């Protein structure tokens, strides 16, 4: 009994916790390794890659200096995004695939101005600018609105069948458009069928690359979004020059062949990295799917941002739809090529702000660009000569370009990457209302004789400035 009382207690076992280890920062690598994160199950053959094949970005450790952490890591990561991001590697193939998706979908939709001019002067003479604007507006509306459904499909893991359906609908719509001669036929084929195909293609193109990047996400999305500007350069010039040579029908078929090649290549390049966030292999899983998940709007920052995006959409694309009408009515030289100039400037406005956004914050970059676009829109009627049109096209194209690249990247930082499809989809659905009515309202204000340019400019400019103010409510 005495021995049991007086016997010395055993020495405590030394324990080592992850908190007792000082983070190690490597000076020679731009990606600091400060904490080991669990590996992520992949859906492709990249599972056996070693950590040395490409750098990774992880969540910062708890012992990090908060101020230094914000400076080095850029935008904050959502709390349940404790993931490792490759920041490259196969992700660059996904960026290429996303570029091709936006080239065919948003890029072709950005060619609306050349179609409005051709329909008004040739194929659909007598139709007003407002009536013709409904064709383009329905394309933008469905491109974004379909995201509310396609985003949920993406999160269930069925992005490839959805993408294949988008390819089929695009080729079907384009071939049927080549045979159309009446307004209702063009509205159904170009406005409805092509619009739905854009929604399937665009959603996959802007969502998959975000699973591969966090620190470089805005830069990667800038490259992806540049595809829409590239399409806005190529397609108007192609259409303007091919129609006099081979006719409207064969021009549409040539575009269908180009799209078939580009989208097939994108289909090969795009691969998701994370497992589906919704398990639909059981009846309970399917019942759990909410095709319209309005719960995301409980987050105030998200709701403000979507509202700002919708307001900006009401006026942002008015110059893209009516610039050729403006240059025709004011006898400005190089008519038919100004849409290409706008999109060329927009391409730089989508890439360069993306690199800046990764350093100073995404909304910190988006706000001044949208504000500048709104101010430029207010003075659009002053560009009634060649010099003015050159300056406006370059400045407005660059300022408005950040919208397409930074909107998805900004939404991506508001929640976990595993549900990014749903959050992007619901945001696009909210923005779609602006895309649906914005251009027709601008066309109605413009009037049947295309004379009220000041009214159209004030409406569009005020909407874009309002969108900029709402987007600024979100943290950088």
Q: Which residues does each PLM region occupy?
A:
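Intrinsically disordered, low-complexity terminal tails of fungal membrane proteins
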Residues: 1-88, 272, 280-288, 476
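Extracytoplasmic gate region of multi-pass secondary transporters
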Residues: 104, 108-119, 297-364, 408, ...
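Intracellular juxtamembrane helix-capping segments at the cytosolic ends
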Residues: 119, 191, 198-213, 220-221, ...
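Interfacial helix-cap and linker-helix signal at transmembrane-aqueous boundaries
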Residues: 119-120, 153-154, 234-247, 327-328, ...
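Helix-loop-helix hairpin linking two adjacent transmembrane segments in secondary transporters
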Residues: 215-216, 223-274
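C-terminal transmembrane helical hairpin of 12-TM major facilitator-type secondary transporters
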Residues: 330, 336, 340-346, 350-414, ...
């Amino acid at each position: 009994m005495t021995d049991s009382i007086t016997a010395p207690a055993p020495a405590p076992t030394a324990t080592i916790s992850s908190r007792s280890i000082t983070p190690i920062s490597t000076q020679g690598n731009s990606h600091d390794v400060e904490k080991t994160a669990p590996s992520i199950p992949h859906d492709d053959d990249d599972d056996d890659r070693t950590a040395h094949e490409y750098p990774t970005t992880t969540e910062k450790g708890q012992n990090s200096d908060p101020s230094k952490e914000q400076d080095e890591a850029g935008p904050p990561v959502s709390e349940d995004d404790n993931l490792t991001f490759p920041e490259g590697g196969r992700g660059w193939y996904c960026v290429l695939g996303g570029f091709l998706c936006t080239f065919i979908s948003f890029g072709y939709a950005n060619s609306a101005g050349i179609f409005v001019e051709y329909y008004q002067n040739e194929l659909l003479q007598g139709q007003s600018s407002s009536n013709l604007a409904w064709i383009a507006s329905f394309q933008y509306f469905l491109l974004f609105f379909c995201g509310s459904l396609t985003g949920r499909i993406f999160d269930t893991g069925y992005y490839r069948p959805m993408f294949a359906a988008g390819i089929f609908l695009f080729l079907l719509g384009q071939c049927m458009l080549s045979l159309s001669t009446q307004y209702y036929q063009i509205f159904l084929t170009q406005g409805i069928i092509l619009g739905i195909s854009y929604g399937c293609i665009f959603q996959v193109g802007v969502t998959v690359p975000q699973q591969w990047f966090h620190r470089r996400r805005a830069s990667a999305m800038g490259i992806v979004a540049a595809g829409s500007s590239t399409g806005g350069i190529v397609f108007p010039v192609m259409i303007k020059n091919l129609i006099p040579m081979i006719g409207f029908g064969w021009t549409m078929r040539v575009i269908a062949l180009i799209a078939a090649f580009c989208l097939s290549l994108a289909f090969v390049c795009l691969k998701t990295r994370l497992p589906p966030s919704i398990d639909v292999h059981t009846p309970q899983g399917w019942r759990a799917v909410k095709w319209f998940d309005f719960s995301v709007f409980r987050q105030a920052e998200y709701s403000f941002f979507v509202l700002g995006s919708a307001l900006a959409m009401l006026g942002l694309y008015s110059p893209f739809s009516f610039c050729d009408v403006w240059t025709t009515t004011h006898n400005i030289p190089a008519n038919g090529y100004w849409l290409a100039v706008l999109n060329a400037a927009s391409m730089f406005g989508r890439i360069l702000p993306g690199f800046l956004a990764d350093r100073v914050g995404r909304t910190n970059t988006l706000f001044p660009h949208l504000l500048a676009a709104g101010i430029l829109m207010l003075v659009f009627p002053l560009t009634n000569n060649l010099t003015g049109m050159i300056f406006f096209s370059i400045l407005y194209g660059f300022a408005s370009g950040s919208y397409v690249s930074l909107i998805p990247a900004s939404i991506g930082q508001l929640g976990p990457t595993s549900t990014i499809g749903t959050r992007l989809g619901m945001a696009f659905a909210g923005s779609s209302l602006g895309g649906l009515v914005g251009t027709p309202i601008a066309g109605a204000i413009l009037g049947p004789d295309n004379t009220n340019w000041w009214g159209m400019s004030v409406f569009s400019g005020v909407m874009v400035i309002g969108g900029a103010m709402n987007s600024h409510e979100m943290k950088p």
